[in-house]
Curated annotation (Swiss-Prot):
Tissue: Expressed by the venom gland.
Keyword Nucleotide-binding appears in the UniProt entry: no
Key words, A-Z: Cytolysis, Secreted
Functional summary from the UniProt entry: Causes weak hemolysis, mild mast cell degranulation, and small LDH release. Therefore, this peptide may be considered a weak cytolytic agent acting on mast cells, through two different mechanisms of interaction with the cells. The interaction with mast cells occurs through two different mechanisms: firstly, the peptide may bind to a G-protein coupled receptor (GPCR) related to the control of mast cell exocytosis, and secondly, it may cause a minor structural disorganization of the mast cell membrane. Does not have antimicrobial activity.
Subcellular location as annotated: Secreted
Taxonomic placement: Eukaryota, Metazoa, Ecdysozoa, Arthropoda, Chelicerata
GO biological process, one term: killing of cells of another organism
Name of the molecule in the record: Cryptide TyPep-9
Keyword Secreted: yes
Cleaved signal peptide residues: none
GO cellular component, one term: extracellular region
Primary localization class, coarse: secreted
Source species: Tityus serrulatus
Length: 8
């Protein structure tokens, strides 16, 4: 999910 990329 896009939020996973933001977490990184």
């Amino acid at each position: 999910i896009p939020e996973d990329i933001i977490k990184k």
